[in-house]
Swiss-Prot record:
Main localization, broad class: endoplasmic reticulum
One GO cellular component, as annotated: oligosaccharyltransferase complex
Protein's cellular compartments: Endoplasmic reticulum membrane
Lumenal compartment residues: 1-4
Record-level GO BP terms: protein N-linked glycosylation; protein N-linked glycosylation via asparagine
Function: Subunit of the oligosaccharyl transferase (OST) complex that catalyzes the initial transfer of a defined glycan (Glc(3)Man(9)GlcNAc(2) in eukaryotes) from the lipid carrier dolichol-pyrophosphate to an asparagine residue within an Asn-X-Ser/Thr consensus motif in nascent polypeptide chains, the first step in protein N-glycosylation. N-glycosylation occurs cotranslationally and the complex associates with the Sec61 complex at the channel-forming translocon complex that mediates protein translocation across the endoplasmic reticulum (ER). All subunits are required for a maximal enzyme activity.
Stated family: Belongs to the OST4 family.
Membrane topology of this protein: Single-pass type III membrane protein
UniProt source species: Drosophila persimilis
Subunit description: Component of the oligosaccharyltransferase (OST) complex.
UniProt keyword annotation of Membrane present: yes
Protein name: Dolichyl-diphosphooligosaccharide--protein glycosyltransferase subunit 4
Amino acid sequence: MITDVQLAIFSNVLGVFLFLLVVAYHYINANTGKSSPKAK
């Protein structure tokens, strides 16, 4: 069975990964949105 400590570590790692994924998505989305009008 999964212990409380293992569950806490898993949830923390998953939370950090999802947070970084959201930050990376917004960073990429913001850069492509600003650079497209300049190229045109």
